Amino acid sequence: MKQLLVSIAIVFASVLTATGQNHSFSLSGKWDFQIDREDIGTKEQWFKKSLDDQINLPGSMPEKLKGDNVTARTQWTGSLYDSSYYFNPYMEKYRIEGQVKLPFFLTPDKHYVGVAWYQKKVTIPSDWKGERIILFLERPHIETTVWVNTKEIGMQNSLCVPHVYDLTSAVTPGKPCRITIRVDNRIKEINVGPDSHSITDQTQGNWNGIVGKIELQTTPKVYFDDIQVYPDLSNGKALVRMNVKSSSTAKGEITLSAESFNTDTRHNVPPVQQSFRIQAGDNRVEMELPMGKDFLTWDEFNPALYKLTAMLNSGKQSEKKQVQFGMRDFKIEGKWFYVNGRKTMLRGTVENCDFPLTGYAPMD
């Protein structure tokens, strides 16, 4: 990561009045769709053709009744700890096709593990000219590969963060394009184990699809790629670490401010400002946000939170991002946890992610 060359001038100032106007365009709704059982679509360049079925997104294939009928021969994701289901005479009626019920797995109406293709034609808004344009997939499962028209954009396979693709060089504002997404839910590089609650058919299920937000979004050419806040109670401040990305050298200024929420006590943190000069690519920026003498702390009894507002101004473009955080100190001493100096017992429940109707947790 390239180090930021900073002209440090941290001053207390008023909040900038200019706000970043990031745009978004929902791609929810009807998509063209096709199952690729033999995994031949990439070789045959299915991104160049029209797919032969349709599906509504966001959603999973089982939820939309796409895939194979469940039979006693279905290959499940998960260990079979009791195989008597397959030969016990008492269970015979539950092995009949069309009446299949399993005693230890959820039994969806449809099941599929493999590759499926999703395709949609869209026109990029003409007023997005000069902006960075991204495809945001909040929760695909598991691996995605994206094409715009015939250009491959890339592949991502994270199970814990959204898949985000930069389409700027592949699309033209005001003109139509075809977005094709190949989704593969086979267990490959991302192998959390066949009995992991996130994929096993005993609980959540190993589904193919895309859920949550599916959007085209814009950012300025200079933008916040990541913002992390580290509270420092002993010094009454928060350290804010930012990754600022740019397609070229740039300069400007960042303003940070914060206000309390999730509490009856109102506390506005005075803004601080810092100028920057960056290179193309990733640039690390660090700023300190003094919280004042009367800052609110977070714990289970008084869960006060803060909403950090970060404003980035670079020439004619600006961006605004918000991140929530709590002022709390968490330590381990011996066998005990301490939150803000108070000995704390942490309790929890075992949640197996059982969502038989959809295969995934609610995304709202």
Language-model features: locations:
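Glycine-centered tight-turn motifs at strand-turn-strand junctions
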Residues: 175, 278-290
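Short, aromatic- and glycine-rich surface loops/edge beta-strands on solvent-exposed regions
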Residues: 178-181, 302-314
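N-terminal carbohydrate-binding accessory modules
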Residues: 309-364
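Beta-strand-rich binding/interaction modules
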Residues: 146-148, 237-276, 285
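Bacterial Sec-dependent N-terminal signal peptides
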Residues: 1-22
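Signal that preferentially marks extracellular ectodomain short beta-strand elements
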Residues: 165-170, 287-303
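Surface beta-strand/loop "capping" patches
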Residues: 218-249
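Accessory beta-strand-rich segments of carbohydrate-active enzymes
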Residues: 25-27, 34-38, 67, 78, ...
